[in-house]
Structure formats: C-alpha cells, structure tokens
Amino acid sequence: MQRAARPLVSVSDLDADKAAALKLIPIPSALEARLDAYVALLQQWQAKTNLVAPSTLPQLWTRHVADSLQLVSLMPHARRWLDFGSGGGFPGVVLACAMADVGGHVTLVERIAKKAAFLREALRVAGAPGTVVLADIGDNVDRFPQALDCITARAVAPLHQLIGFAEPLMTPGITKALFLKGQDVDAELTESTKYWKFQPKLHASLTGGQGWIVEIDHIERRT
C-alpha cells in the first residue's frame, strides 16, 4: 500500500503563523483568499522543487508572505511593479495578489525555468495580475517594462549589483526601488557607495529580526 506524503508543515503550525502574520498586516478577505491559494500551491511544489528554505516553512506566512506584503504600504500608489529574481514568488507573487483589486500588474523576472513555471502557475491559481519573464536579471533589459513605479528584489544579489540592474529601468521622480536586506545591510550600503551615488532610506522590517528595506529613488553611477 502506498502511503500518503507527509505534510511539510503541520496545519496547526501554519494556521498559527498565518494568524500572527495577519495581525501584523491586516488584509481584505479577497486578498487573503488569493494568498491562501498561492501558499497551498507553494507547499505542493516545495515537495519536488526547492522554492524556499525548508527550515522557514513553519513561518511561511510571517517570514515570507508578511515580509513581502509590507512593501505595498511603502508604495501605496504604485501599480507597475517589477521583481528581480522572483524564485518562489517573494515578493513578486504576493505583490501581484495585492494588485488584483487595484488594477496593478507585476513583472516577475526569473532565470530558472522550473521556478518560472511555478510562478506562472501561482499567478494563474491565485488570480493575480502578472507576467513572468524567463531571463537573467542582468540581461535583456529591453524585455522588461520601461514605465515602472517600483522595482523590488529579495535574497537575490548584493545591493550594489541590484542597484546596477535597476538603474537603467528607473525614471527619475517616478520609479523607486525597494530591496529587502538582512543583517549585513550596512556593509552592503558601504560597498555600494563605491560604485553608485544614491541617498537610501532604511525601513526596519515589520516582521522583526534583522531585516531591513532599502528604499532608493535616484541613482547615479560614479565615474
């Protein structure tokens, strides 16, 4: 007799983590339903494709979903988003779920075909407005939208590289970048100033820990 696969994380643990996440960032029921569909799909795919670190699965809602959702409050009027290196969909798919009721759209850039396939399925299942571009972040800039409100990235590359990827896509006075970073943010900022002129604004993550969001709205290359 074939045994059913054991759940990657218990339902009770995930429900408790979801409750904690929604206490941090309350959301409408329609958005909650879309995120539920996305999280369920991610758990299915995680069994065969490494989309998030397995150790973080019990904190999927607080560690990943809420961490991504907080970007919306920093750019409440943004409708045209681009997410570099979307991977398992954080923050790209979460942002797309949030854009469904406000007429927004998210472009998700991913270089690994298997993950890009997951992202497309996640957008479909969640009913979220987005487009997946299978590409390396540093290449094919002409394939990305040229009119953007916000560029995001999470756990993809060092800050100075992300700034370089974002710079040709940013329209002064319109586009901002929001990069989610960890405990090494100060060192990454110092390294980035060797190559770029910019005035970052730091936001402490609502999810606690040592997370930070680096907000940038103007970039100049040092000569």
Swiss-Prot record:
Its main location: cytoplasm. Gene3D superfamilies: Vaccinia Virus protein VP39 (3.40.50.150). NCBIfam families: rsmG_gidB. The keyword Methyltransferase applies. This is Ribosomal RNA small subunit methyltransferase G. Coiled coil: none annotated. Keywords: Cytoplasm, Methyltransferase, rRNA processing, S-adenosyl-L-methionine, Transferase. Belongs to the methyltransferase superfamily. RNA methyltransferase RsmG family.
